[in-house]
């Protein structure tokens, strides 16, 4: 969690492993969720900077629907203000927001059980950023490894104050609705530690108001982009969920492989080939070693055909549902308006508690 950073990213081949059990399954936390799902509130989300892709699908989106269906209160944030943390303008914001809504609904996010909202529609959330900034030091923000990585890949010529304070804004996202469970990839865990620090320090200074959110670490395998680097919405190296079957075939055909014609699953020695094998295995819910063995000496061309067929078959029902929702954008946008109303009510109640706890703000 992001809540708000891309939820499925890759940092290298060593992270790729065979398909695992559902995120966090078998842990004490997962057992508590199963026993009493109604006691948990999840805050998660995606920045509207481009279409969601296969990395998001396997890395976080399926888990959101799973948690919703268990009975967890799932709140999905579209952090439109945070688009400008690492770029100077928010391009195509309305288009990308509509796209996220279509993806969420087509994937199974149910507006009757889950909430979707935007930053810009919830003033109380953003106001919480001010007292929260007093609870962390500049040195602590500078040391955050996720911020360092984002700064390194920023599109801006200079680091903005919004970029540096990004983890605190994320704390406001989570704590505005009293979120107590945040699904994150391992590369996002430092952000959640800032949220926990803010909650703990506020409670110590002003009295107990906030829960310290628990981390639900994703164990979902990580997929490389088609160029063999970190998969990203902004790097043109992903396969969007909304792509057509032909577009998917073209993107996968251009994926980086290697010169060895014999296909094997070896993430450390053959990261690019292994990522394609893994993607096939995830789509088919099979073991990647078996998938690789079946392709054998077929080479990269056979591998890419297999991947393309698996992806298009897996996403066909999603794409059909998405196309139906796209025919009624009035309804789709009404889902966001209703979510904004609920998020406003939650954030305003939290802000009232913060003001009361701080005493001087009446």
Language model feature labels by segment:
Residues 72-73, 138-142, 176-183, 281-291, ...:
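Short helix-capping/linker segments at secondary-structure and domain boundaries
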Residues 127-130, 143-206, 210-225, 233, ...:
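Classical nucleotidyltransferase
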């Amino acid at each position: 969690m992001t809540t708000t950073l891309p939820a499925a990213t890759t940092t290298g081949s060593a992270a790729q492993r065979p398909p695992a059990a559902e995120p966090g399954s078998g842990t004490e936390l997962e057992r508590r969720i199963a026993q009493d799902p109604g006691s948990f509130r999840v805050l998660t989300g995606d920045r509207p900077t481009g279409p969601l892709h296969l990395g998001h699908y396997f890395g976080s989106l399926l888990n959101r629907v799973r948690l919703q269906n268990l009975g967890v209160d799932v709140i999905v944030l579209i952090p439109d203000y945070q688009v400008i943390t690492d770029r100077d303008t928010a391009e195509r914001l309305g288009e990308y927001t509509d796209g996220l809504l279509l993806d969420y609904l087509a994937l199974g996010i149910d507006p009757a059980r889950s909430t979707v909202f935007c930053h810009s529609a919830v003033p109380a959330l953003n106001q919480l950023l001010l007292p929260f900034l007093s609870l962390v030091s500049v040195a602590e923000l500078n040391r955050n490894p996720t911020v360092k990585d984002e700064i390194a890949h920023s599109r801006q010529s200079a680091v903005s104050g919004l970029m540096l304070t990004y983890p605190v804004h994320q704390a406001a996202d989570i704590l505005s609705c009293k979120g107590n469970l945040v699904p994150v990839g391992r590369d996002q865990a430092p952000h959640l530690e800032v949220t926990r620090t803010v909650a703990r320090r506020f409670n110590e200074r002003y009295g107990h108001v906030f829960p310290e959110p628990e981390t639900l670490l994703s164990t979902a395998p990580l997929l490389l982009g088609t160029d063999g680097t970190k998969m990203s919405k902004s790097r043109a190296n992903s396969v969007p969920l909304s792509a057509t079957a032909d577009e998917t075939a073209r993107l996968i055909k251009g994926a980086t492989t290697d010169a060895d014609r014999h296909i094997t699953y070896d993430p450390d020695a053959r990261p690019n080939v292994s990522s394609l094998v893994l993607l096939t295995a995830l789509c088919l819910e099979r073991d990647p070693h078996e998938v690789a063995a079946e392709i054998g000496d077929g080479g990269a061309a056979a591998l890419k055909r297999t991947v393309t067929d698996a992806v298009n078959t897996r996403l066909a029902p999603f794409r059909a549902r998405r196309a139906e929702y796209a025919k009624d954008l009035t309804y789709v946008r009404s889902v966001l308006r209703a979510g904004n109303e609920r998020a406003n009510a939650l954030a305003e109640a939290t802000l009232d508690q913060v003001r009361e706890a701080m005493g001087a703000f009446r």
